[in-house]
Structure formats: C-alpha cells, structure tokens
C-alpha cells in the first residue's frame, strides 16, 4: 500500500505516461482483490505461492504479445488451461488489475479537485438521489419525453479509443487492446441477450462502458447547457475534446467547429432536461415535438457517425406525458390532470371556476413484478402464490427471514409510489408464499399452519418505514396515515432488488 501511495504522490504530469509498468506490480492485484500485501492474491484452490502465481500472470501477458490476432482459430476459445492452470481465473485477475489502473487517472482528478489544484471537468456527474426531486419538482411542468435506450454492444476498439482521452500511455492501451481481444474471444463479454449491467460482467468492462457514456454525455450536455438559462461561461472544455479528436482523425472537429453558433441555435431549448440511470436515459422538454425530433435524430447521428454504434430512430420514443406513462427506475411515472372547482364571490356576484392542475403519479408496475415473482417461483403467471420448493429444506427462521427481506426491500424501494395498492398485492403474494412454503416443509395445510402460528408470522412482514413512522407519530394516527399514503424517498435506494429487471 505504501508503494501505491508513493506512486500517487508522483508529479502529476508524469502519471498519465507511466501506467504500463503497473501491470507487472504485484500490489496492484492485491488492491484489486482487497487483500494485504502479505497475503495470497489468488483463490485458495490454487496450490502455489504468491510468486509462482504472479509469474503465471506475467507469462499470460507475454503470450498475448506472441499470439497472431490476425488469424482466428476455432480452437482458441477452448484453450482453458495454461500449463495446467485455469486461464479464466488468471484472465479475471488481469482484468481486475486493469480496472484498478484505469481508475488511477480518474482518481487523480478527484484528488486534485479536493486539494483545490485543479477543477474537475466532469460537469455531468450527479447523484442518483437528484433524480427523485427532479421527478417531483420538474416533471409535472414538462410536456414531452423521449425514452432513450443507450445502444450496445459497442466495439471494444471504440472503448479503448474513448479511454485515450484519460489515459495517455500508448503501451498500456496497446496491452489493454490485446487483452480485450483475447478475453473477448474467450468469454464473449458482449452479447445481445445479456445486459451490460449484469453481475457476470467484470469491473473493467463496466468502467470502459461508463467512460464511453461519459464521453457521449459530455458532448450532449454541452449543447444542452449552452442552450439553457444555465450556460457555461466558456467553451474551452468542449473544444479541448475537439482538439483531442482532431489528432486521431475523428470527424467531430468538422461537425462542431465549422458552424458552431448555428448548431447551438439548432438545439436552443431552455427547458430541456436529461436524466440517466444505467443504460437508460430520458430527455424531457416543455417545447414542441419538433425540437424533440431534432434531438432524436441528433442522438442517432452522434452514435452512428462519432462512436460507430449502429442505432435506429425506433430506439428513441417520443411520448406526450399527459397520455403515456414512463417506465424509468422501476416506476411507471405519468402526469394526470387534477380538476377542482373553486367558488369565488365578489359582492353580490358569485363565480364558479374550474382549476386544473397537473399531478405527478408514480405507480408500482404490478405486471412486471408479478412476472419477476413467477420467474423465481413465488407465484404462477396469474399471480397466485405458490410454495418455494427449493427453500423447504431450510430452517423456519431462514425461510421467514428470506421472505421478509425481499418484502421489505421491495416495500422500501417502492415507498415513493403515490398509490400503494399494487405494493400491497406484492406483499400479499410474498406472505402467502412464505406460509405455503412452511406448510409444505411441515407437511401441513395452510389453514392448520396459520392457526398454530397465529399472527406472529404476519408481524414479521411489517415494513421498516411503518415502524419508523409509528415511532415519529405515536399519537397522531391521522398524521401517520397521511404520511404513509404519500411518497417517501429513501436515500439508500440506489440499488433495486434483484426481482426488478432493467434489461
């Protein structure tokens, strides 16, 4: 760790040019695996010491330089062993080592920002918790929304070239390119039927994908901020990237530098909002559908001409918020009119006025959730609870604890829903599935088991927010009911339960 800290304390101008030697430093892999330097960096099933294990990593890197990647052999993907060792294991180790090194330039910018020596240039970074205030405060004032699915798969060469803006070590990037080519052929990282954010994807690939998204957003948000009321004071951040792409013969210099004021006028919209979570983003505007279509075809051309990613206009849907719901962050969000009649009297004359207000609704997607529960055998396709047969061998405490944990996680996340009826249905399915699982284990009926256990089982399913609100408002039942029926956003809901799909 001291050696790693010493490297971080080197002169800032030299750090970007000497990333390649870190690949052959053992402490990098110790950091990647969260082990100390005096412990093994390999799994316990590898019966060799640290030096022997690290030598295998060096040999694997040397083999990458010796292979002829112009000739693709059908047997290359079947070469799982290197001298009797698991190639998948060592490729995963090298992948995590690459990820640690790739993060160094980003970490240095953060350290420089904290020290006040340099301003971080990533203006598009926001916390996920800012999405929920945006939905409540801004969404009801907007008219149209574009549901954008960021295209993938991405060619690995595009990911490496995008990284060149941050890591400027040619030797390191060349080795990374060879490794991705070899590892891609071995494990087929990018497939059409697998989500980029699935747990099977390594940390390195997610980091490369996020750098690609960051680069795409830096261009998109620059145009958006220039056309809004909150403009940047200068354009040097954007033109710094133009100078970078000009060196590698990218067409962005021709696209943006020739007629830059006209392009800004083309995207002029002071009410454009951009929000992204994982691989899905939304563009919302108060303006006409014409401008939304302009942004739509701009995004398609940006992906196809600049990032060489095939995309179709059909991947971007433009909907009117008053007529369609938006599926985002696991919620179904919509805007519905809330009509109220106000009677006003002035002297002897009275007037009846219709007051129409827009109300923002967040609903629990009951059908996808029931489909997710049916997929993991908590219920059938119609939503009727069934026993979880694979858990019947566990203890009663473990069975109840598993069901309660899933129920509380879902209830905790969907506490931001404006209507709780669908959430109550999901909780009912989980409760009855738990009872049926316990009854199956004890070879009893559900009715008999409930009579014997009483209400103690159902008390376990009380959600955490119900308990917290009952402590805050112990004597005001009406206040408790009003707060519980309303939306409650929690700051620890950045991770949705596994039952909710983002694919």
From Swiss-Prot:
One biological process term from GO is: mRNA processing
Which Pfam family is one of this chain's hits?
A: MatK_N
- List UniProt keywords, sorted A-Z: Chloroplast, mRNA processing, Plastid, RNA-binding, tRNA processing
The record's subcellular location field reads:
Plastid, Chloroplast
The cross-references to InterPro entries, in alphabetical order and at most eight, read:
Domain_X, Maturase_MatK, Maturase_MatK_N
Q: Which GO terms describe its molecular function?
A: RNA binding
Q: What does the entry list under GO cellular component?
A: chloroplast
What the protein does comes down to: Usually encoded in the trnK tRNA gene intron. Probably assists in splicing its own and other chloroplast group II introns.
The family annotation for this protein states:
Belongs to the intron maturase 2 family. MatK subfamily.
The molecule here is called Maturase K
Q: Which gene encodes it?
A: matK
């Amino acid at each position: 760790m001291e050696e790693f800290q010493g490297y971080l304390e080197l002169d800032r101008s030299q750090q970007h040019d000497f990333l390649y030697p870190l690949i052959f430093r053992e402490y990098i892999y110790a950091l990647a695996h969260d082990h100390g330097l005096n412990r093994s960096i390999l799994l316990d099933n590898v019966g060799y010491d640290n030096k022997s294990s690290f030598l295998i990593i060096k040999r694997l890197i040397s083999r990458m330089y010796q292979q002829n990647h112009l000739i693709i052999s059908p047997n290359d993907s079947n070469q799982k062993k290197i001298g009797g060792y698991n190639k998948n294991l060592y490729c995963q180790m090298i992948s995590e080592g690459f990820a640690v090194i790739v993060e160094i330039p980003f970490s240095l910018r953060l350290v420089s920002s904290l020290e006040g020596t340099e301003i971080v240039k990533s203006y598009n970074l926001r916390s996920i918790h800012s999405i929920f205030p945006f939905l409540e405060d801004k969404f009801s004032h907007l008219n149209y929304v574009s549901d954008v699915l960021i295209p993938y798969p991405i060619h690995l060469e595009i990911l490496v070239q995008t990284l060149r803006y941050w890591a400027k070590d040619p030797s390191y990037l060349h080795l990374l390119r060879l490794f991705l080519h070899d590892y891609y052929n071995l494990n087929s990282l990018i497939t059409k039927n697998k989500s980029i954010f699935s747990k099977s994807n390594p940390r390195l690939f997610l980091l490369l994908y996020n750098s690609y998204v960051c680069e795409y957003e830096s261009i998109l948000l620059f145009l958006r901020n220039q056309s809004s009321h909150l403009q940047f004071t200068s354009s040097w951040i954007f033109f710094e990237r133009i100078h970078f792409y000009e060196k590698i013969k990218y067409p962005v210099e021709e696209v943006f530098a020739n007629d830059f004021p006209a392009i800004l006028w083309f995207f002029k919209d002071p009410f454009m909002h951009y929000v992204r979570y994982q691989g899905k983003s939304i563009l919302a505007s108060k303006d006409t559908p014409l401008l939304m279509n302009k942004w739509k075809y701009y995004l398609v051309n940006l992906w196809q001409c600049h990032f060489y990613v095939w995309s179709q206009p059909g991947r971007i849907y433009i909907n009117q918020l008053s007529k369609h719901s938006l599926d985002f962050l696991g919620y179904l969000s919509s805007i519905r009119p809330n009509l109220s009649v106000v009677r006003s009297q002035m002297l002897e004359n009275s007037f009846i006025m219709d007051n129409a207000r827009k109300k923002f609704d967040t609903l629990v997607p009951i059908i996808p959730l029931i489909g997710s529960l049916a997929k993991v055998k908590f219920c059938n396709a119609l939503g009727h609870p069934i026993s979880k047969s694979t858990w019947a061998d566990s203890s009663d405490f473990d069975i109840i604890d598993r069901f309660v944990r899933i129920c509380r996680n879902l209830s905790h996340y969907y506490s931001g829903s404006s209507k709780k009826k669908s959430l109550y249905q999901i909780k009912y399915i989980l409760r009855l599935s738990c009872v049926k699982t316990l009854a199956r284990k004890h070879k009893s009926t559900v009715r008999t088991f409930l009579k014997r256990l009483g209400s103690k089982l159902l008390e376990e399913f009380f959600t955490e927010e119900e308990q917290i609100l009952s402590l805050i408002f112990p004597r005001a039942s009406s206040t408790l009911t009003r707060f519980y029926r309303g939306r409650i956003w929690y700051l620890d809901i950045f991770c949705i339960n596994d039952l909710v799909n983002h694919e």
